[in-house]
From Swiss-Prot:
GO cellular component, one term: viral occlusion body
Superkingdom of origin: Viruses
A Pfam cross-reference name: Polyhedrin
Keyword presence, Nucleotide-binding: no
Family to which the UniProt record says this protein belongs: Belongs to the polyhedrin family.
Name used for this protein in its record: Polyhedrin
InterPro entries referenced in this protein's UniProt entry, alphabetically: Polyhedrin
C-alpha cells in the first residue's frame, strides 16, 4: 500500500534541466549550418577579390564604346485590341538590300581599327493620336528555324510592358558567339551578299518581334526601328616625336 510519502516507481521522476548545459537540438543544427555557410561565403569572397579592380556596366547598352545608330525604317502600324503585330520581316530582299547598302555608306564610320562588340535592335513606339491612355506591349524570340515563316498577327500571350521612353531594346549578340567582329571593310569589299550572311547573321540573331497595346480600341502606332552597333574604339597611336607640331 503506497502512501503519499512512499516511493512509487510508476509515478516517474521530474527533472529540472539547466539551460547552461542543455540546448535545443534545432538551434544547434541551425548554428552549425550558419557557421558552415559563413565559411563558404568567405572563401567565395576571397576568390572574387581580384575582380574588384575591374569595372563593368550594369546595362551593356550604356557601357564603354560608341553607339552607332542605323535607322531601318519609320512606319505607322494599326494594331487591333488583344492582338500583336510583327515588326520586321528580315527575309524581304528589298529590305535587305536597302538596309545593308545604307550600312555600307560613308555615313556609317566603321574602319579596320574598330570592332563591333554588340548589336542592339531598338524599337521606339509612339501614339499618333493625342490624349490616348494606354501602354505598349512587346514580345520577341531570338532564334527560330530558317524555314519558319512568322505570322503577321498573333494574340497577346505573356507580353512584356515596354519601359521608359516607350523603347524596347534587344541584344542580338549570340552567347559565346564570334564577337568582336573585326576587319569589316575587307570582308564586305570581297562579297557583299556573303558579308551579310557569313559575318552579320553568323554572329547575331535575327529576332522575331511583335508589338501591341493594352488598349481596348484600335490604335495607330508610329514605329521607329533601328540597329545600334556597339563599337569599341581604340586609343590613338602615340606620336613618335615630341616637338612643336605635337
Amino acid at each position: 500500500m503506497y502512501t503519499r510519502y512512499s516511493y512509487n516507481p510508476a509515478l516517474g521522476r521530474t527533472y529540472v534541466y539547466d539551460n547552461k548545459f542543455y540546448k535545443n537540438l534545432g538551434s544547434v543544427i541551425k548554428n552549425a549550418k550558419r557557421k558552415e555557410h559563413l565559411l563558404q561565403h568567405e572563401i567565395e569572397e576571397r576568390t572574387l577579390d581580384p575582380l574588384e579592380r575591374y569595372v563593368v556596366a550594369e546595362d551593356p547598352f550604356l557601357g564603354p564604346g560608341k553607339n552607332q545608330k542605323l535607322t531601318l525604317f519609320k512606319e505607322i502600324r494599326i494594331v487591333k485590341p488583344d492582338t500583336m503585330k510583327l515588326v520586321v520581316n528580315w527575309s524581304g530582299k528589298e529590305f535587305l538590300r536597302e538596309t545593308w547598302t545604307r550600312f555600307m555608306e560613308d555615313s556609317f564610320p566603321i574602319v579596320n581599327d574598330q570592332e563591333i562588340m554588340d548589336v542592339f535592335l531598338v524599337i521606339n513606339m509612339r501614339p499618333t493620336r493625342p490624349n490616348r491612355c494606354f501602354r505598349f506591349l512587346a514580345q520577341h524570340a531570338l532564334r527560330c528555324d530558317p524555314d519558319y515563316v512568322p505570322h503577321e498577327v498573333i494574340r497577346i500571350v505573356e507580353p512584356v510592358y515596354v519601359g521608359t521612353n516607350n523603347e524596347y531594346r534587344i541584344s542580338l549578340a549570340k552567347k559565346g558567339g564570334g564577337c568582336p567582329v573585326m576587319n569589316l571593310h575587307s570582308e564586305y569589299t570581297n562579297s557583299f551578299e556573303e558579308f551579310i550572311n557569313r559575318v552579320i547573321w553568323e554572329n547575331f540573331y535575327k529576332p522575331i518581334v511583335y508589338v501591341g497595346t493594352d488598349s481596348g480600341e484600335e490604335e495607330e502606332i508610329l514605329l521607329e526601328l533601328s540597329l545600334v552597333f556597339k563599337i569599341k574604339e581604340f586609343a590613338p597611336d602615340a606620336p613618335l616625336y615630341n616637338g612643336p607640331a605635337y
